[in-house]
Each structure stands twice: as C-alpha cells, then as structure tokens.
Design a protein with these regions (language model features):
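N-terminal intrinsically disordered, cationic/polar leader segments
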Residues: 1-89
Length: 89
C-alpha cells in the first residue's frame, strides 16, 4: 500500500472544477465533501473519490473535496494529482 508523507492539493476552487486536499491519517480512507449538488450527486462523488484512492493503492488518507460542479473525470484527476504530490517527500 502506498502512503502519504505530507498534505497536498490539486485543482482549483473555480466553477466546473474541484479543489482536492489529501492529508495523511493513521489508517483507512476518510472523505469530507462540500458541494452545492451534494443531495443529488454526493454519493456518486464520494464513490469516485473512494475508488480512485483504492485503485491508486493508498491507505491512511483523508480526502477533502470542495466541488464546484466538476465532472467525474475531473474529480478523479484531481484526487490522483493530490495523491502523487503528497506521496513525494
């Protein structure tokens, strides 16, 4: 399993994008989501984040997503970018 060594961010807090922050935690995967469309798409966004973290082989990660109506592929790219930045010392 891959591990984060530091907190990191990817993305922008702008329309049609997402700002994703990852932080190392002891174990597991925690997701904190802020979105105007959380009622309609909250479960889908969380699923994309969770699957992306698992597929990348990470554990011990808190993912904070500030969504501004981003598409799934954008969220996935932002999560992967933040994980990559956070895994480098």
């Amino acid at each position: 399993m891959a591990q984060l060594v530091k907190a990191a961010q990817a993305g922008f807090d702008e329309k049609n994008d997402a700002l994703v922050t990852v932080e190392p935690i002891a174990s597991g995967i925690e997701i904190e989501l802020t979105s105007k469309v959380i009622r309609q798409y909250g479960n889908q966004i969380k699923s994309v984040v969770l699957n992306t973290v698992k597929e990348a082989g990470f554990d011990g990660v808190k993912v904070i997503v500030q969504d501004k109506n981003a598409w799934d592929y954008t969220i996935k790219a932002r999560v992967l970018g933040a994980l990559e930045r956070g895994s480098k010392a």
